[in-house]
Amino acid sequence: IFGHELPLTVTQMLWVNLIMDTFAAGALASLPPNKEVMKDKPRKNEAFIVTPPMRNQILWIGLAFVAFLMGLLYYFTNAEGEINRHDLACFFTIFVMLQFWNLFNAKAFATGKSAFNGLLHDTGFITVALLIIIGQFFIVTFGGDVFRTVPLSWQDWLLIIGSTSLVLWIGEIFRLFGKKKK
């Protein structure tokens, strides 16, 4: 849509797939059982695993991410229809950080509690979160031609981490004002 070069490379998508399908699944699986789940009525055998609230959250967050990322590609594209390597590294990191913060929203989904609730005791979750951040830093800093990245400045990192964390803070606001009613 915005030129000839894809905004994410195959190796970058492999990293995203690894952190979201493997690491994130491990992080969420490492969480202690939620005692509130046992208070819910059993679901029918033919009921979908993805509930309507879950579907809606996936849909709206997905649409918001796509709109934001498409706008970002437009913003980064120069007059010749190209995006420089620095901006591509920023785009890649923004993409990963959006997923990273949304992992915290997934942790808190349908609990009616903050994503920070019990976080200090969720060592598996914290370990995976740190692994994702550290892995992303090393890939962007040292990935070079393999990952089509250039090192980002600490200002870039602060801006990306701060701005993408809005995903978490917006989720926290929704959880605060939309407490689960029993």
Predicted feature residues:
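Transmembrane helix-loop junctions at the membrane interface of multipass transporters and ion channels
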Residues: I1-E5, Y74, N78-A79, F137-S153
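Membrane-interface capping segments at transmembrane-helix boundaries
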Residues: I173-K182
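Small-residue-rich transmembrane alpha-helices that serve as helix-helix interface/gating elements
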Residues: W15, F92, S153-V167
